[in-house]
Structure formats: structure tokens, C-alpha cells
Amino acid sequence: MKNNCFKPGQVWLDTNGAPIQAHGGSVLFINGTYYWYGENKEKTVGDGKYWTYGIKCYSSTDLYNWQDLGFIIPPSEDEKSPLYPQNMIDRPHIVYNEKTKKFVCWIKIMYLEGIQAVTILTADKITGPYTVIKEKFRPLNMDAGDFDLVIAPDKKGYYYFEKVHTELICATLTDDYTDVTGEYTSHFPLEGPPFVREAPAYFTKDGKHYLITSGTTGYYPNPSEIAVASHYHGPFTVLGNPHVGDETDTSFHSQISSVFKVQGKKNLYIACGDRWLPNLMHVPYKAVRDMFKGWFTGDMAKGEQIVKEYNLPKYEATCSATYVWLPIVFENDKPKIYWHNSWKIEDFE
């Protein structure tokens, strides 16, 4: 049965009838086809064994129906490999370098020994095979968390990333997109989790640069924030929470991973989000906020109290995660996201 609309939060099946596994992902448009890639969470069942089991990719021409292209970056059985599935492999981002004719993929990885760094791979095709060219890379000698990669019309590249638990950094990329030049700017300095901004999702419209960010509460959702600037390096002005009418302060129980513009549409941008924990939607944001604040300010008892009160699992079973794709509309130049139980591309300009 073919899909003819988006149904945010519901299980999204591929053309084979299996749940799509492309979490923390992004969408690229290449030669008339959309490619959606992301983390495969099918083996992340809550036993602490696997975090991400490889990176998968899907293709579509209508954005509703997706064909499984398999692993573009398969898991490794080598415990020393950055792609070993017990490492915390998160948020792959792929860009194309016209100069080198290479697809360049950056992946954030928290290793078993606690090191948080970046692995960089390249390939001749979006579907791979990818070759690791750099691992345990610490850009600007910083611990790098969630991020986005952006390529400007002049082909300069920019890397927006969370300097872990402190602030957001915008770093200029080298011409081959496999390193940073050393030029960078700092944004949104805050006291620590749960308020520090992470999961930056960039998009541009009418010469303005927008960043949607998340708070720092792991897989538990929190209020999003959007900011705007006239240049890639800012300065950014915070516009507030784009999710209109979200009384739960959870971004409609999701975390946005990326934003893309629909081809052939004048103003249709889609915010791609993950509902990481659909079975824990009863946990209020206030409890999550207090739990993370307790953990990161030394009040461990407060955090553990909330864990017990809501019977929270030690390891989250993100295998059941779903997707929340919603349109971004612009009201007086301010991006807004409204909830839709279902919606169609055809309903927007």
C-alpha cells in the first residue's frame, strides 16, 4: 500500500513494509531523487548492547514512499573500529564536494572509553562504499557533539556543532570539507544541560540563516529554539520556540535533526524530527529538565528520584522510535511549526 501523505509520529514503513531506519538523519536531492540516510536503530532494544547498527539509506521521488537501499556505512565487527556498534554513533551528515568529486560524511562518535570525537569518511557515490579517512578527530581541539554541515552557494563549507555542554560553535571547513580552517565563532553560551543548545539544524531563506536547536536532555524531548543571522557566522538572534501550541514543551514529542527545502516548491521547508521515545511520552518535560539539571549540577539524588518516580529505563529502546516530519511556515519572517495529524506536500506552495 503506497503512502500519499505524511503522518507524523506514526510508524513509517518502507516499500518493503519494514519500518524505516534512518534516525538522526538528513535528506539530499540528487539528479531527481531524494536520498534519506540516518542511524539504524533496529537492534537498540534497551539491553545496552547496541547504540547504532550502521548507517542506512533510502530513496524516493515523492517523499512519501521510500525504497531501502541498505547500508551505506555498515557496522564493523572490529572493536577498534569507530563503526563498532557499541560505540555511540550519532547523526551522520553527508555533503558533496564538487572540487574533489567526493561525498564527505561526518559522524559524531562517543567511544566505549569515553572519548567524544568525529569520524570522517568519503565515497564516490551517495550510496558508498565509504572509506574512513579520519577518526577520533577533535575539531579545534574541542569535544564535538551534535552538528550540521552546510555548503554555501560559493561552495564554502561550515560546521555547526555543540562544544559539549557549553556552547554552539560555527567553524569554517577546508576546501575539501574534511577539516576545519581554524576560523570559528561561538554562540549561545549557557550554564550547562539541560539548557545548552545541541542538534543544530540549519536552513536558509531570503538571505537569512536559521538554526533550530534542541536542549540537552538525551533522547528525552525538550523545547526547541530558533535563531536567525545575516551571516553563517552570526551573530544570531534568538526568535524563541518555533513549535506553536506545544503545551508539553517537548517540540511535539520530537527532536529535529535536519531541515530541507522541497524541490519545485516556492517556500516549503520540512523539519525532520525523531520521536525517540514514543513509549515514554507520559514523562513531563519538567521532570526531564529537573533530572538532567540534577545530574549535571551534582544533585544525583534528585535525578535518581525522578528515574524511580517514572520508572525510567537504564538504556532507552530507540528501536521503536518514529519520525515527526512537519512543514515550516513563515509568519512575518518568523519560522513556525504547527502540528498536523497528517499533511500533504500538495497543500503548500
Give the label of every model feature segment.
Residues 1-349:
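Carbohydrate-active catalytic/glycan-binding domains of CAZyme proteins
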